Amino acid sequence: MAIFAATYKEGDPVWQSFLRYKTDYSKQFYFFVIGALIALFILLTDSKFFSATANLWYAVGIGVLFLVFPFHSRVKGTESIIRFGGFQFQPAEFCKVCVALALAKYLSQPETNFTKTRSHLIAAAIVLFPALLTVFQSETGLALVYCAFFIVMYREGLPASILIIASVIAALVIATIVVEPNLLAIGLTIMAGLVIYTMRRSIRRRRGILLIVISLWFVCVGIQRFAVPFLFKHVLQKHQVERIYDLFGKDNPYSKGTDEPDVVSSSRKSETQSSYNVKQSKIAIGSGRFWGKGLLKGTQTRYDFVPEQRTDFIFCTIGEGFGFVGSIVLLGLYLVLLFRIITVAERQRSTFSRCYGYGVASVFFFHIAVNVAMTVGLAPVIGIPLPFVSYGGTSLLTFTILLFVLIRLDADRQMVLR
């Protein structure tokens, strides 16, 4: 319905277009039918099949990702699409199913001891290898989705210290964007000095503590002064850096081609494409008010003021058409779905099924949280679909497979799969 509201043009023959495969909503309808058939096939499959072939599916997923490089078609800046006649297939979407199965398979192996660093590194490699291939296909948004699988590892015993370190690094990157570089370096130095002063008695007894504090100071300053600028200048693409700076209301200071950030210009915000998208999205959501304008009555979405309103920004179509009430109902349904997935995962006797269930919940949560936050300006524009709502055949089929494999595993939850 949201795709129909976002793409319907007045005067279009609705029922005829559904049969002719010419409009986005008719194409999505056909993918819905295909998804229903795949779901039926999954429900009729032996649950042992998924654990037995998990590694094979991972190999297939990686192989298809490699096929993208020689056979890709460039679509809207991304090189992650393979065309089959009139169809487009995005392997990075499908590979999420493969990673969920492979990670669950590895974590459920009797020989896997997840208290050891070696097991942590192997599990991380299973997740990060396809993510790295996806980055090379100019699809950073989908690559970030794979990071959601670290939630599964945390559930299975990944030390909280690793997540804390990752959070501190993320906070330091944000501070590098928001705070003037020299001021941030001074602040880090003052913090290190305060830590040394507070722990002065312990330092007298153990000199190694002083070495650790100084080393951490060097690491933080190195990240702030060298690692983050290198990442923004030489790793991420220009439009990706602009989206990150747009989130904090600043211009991209590296856009002039210099290695040193232009701090003065970054403090004055000019409108970019991504900031325009978010601005129009918030206008559309705000114009819906409490009850919404009604189906096909939204002005922002009906007249294409919001770019990508059928895919990445489809939540604004719901916000304008059905208002605050409709948005809350949709988010409530998502919360119920996530809670149900986690409940199903926790009641599994099999480690494989439990890990797979948490993998499904993690992927759904990341997509929902980031997509909604993106449309209201609380997250950078990274371009990931809203599950079961955004236009896209590959994403619809991927979410369908993820969910129905879990349903099939739950049907045999008394079995212990390995």
Region locations from a protein language model:
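Hydrophobic alpha-helical transmembrane segments of multi-pass inner membrane proteins, especially
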Residues: 3, 10-270, 316-376, 401, ...
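Membrane-interfacial loop-to-helix junctions in multi-pass transporters
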Residues: 69, 118-121, 274, 304-311, ...
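Gly/Ser/Thr-rich beta-alpha loop segments that engage phosphate groups in nucleotides
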Residues: 79, 143, 288-290, 294-300, ...
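Glycine/serine-rich anion-binding loops at beta->alpha junctions
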Residues: 86-98, 138, 289, 293, ...
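Transmembrane helical segments that form the transport core of multi-pass membrane transport proteins
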Residues: 257-259, 264-271, 286-303, 307
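A conserved mid-to-late transmembrane alpha helix and its immediate loop/hinge
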Residues: 278, 282, 291, 295-344
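A juxtamembrane structural motif centered on a specific transmembrane helix
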Residues: 348, 371-418
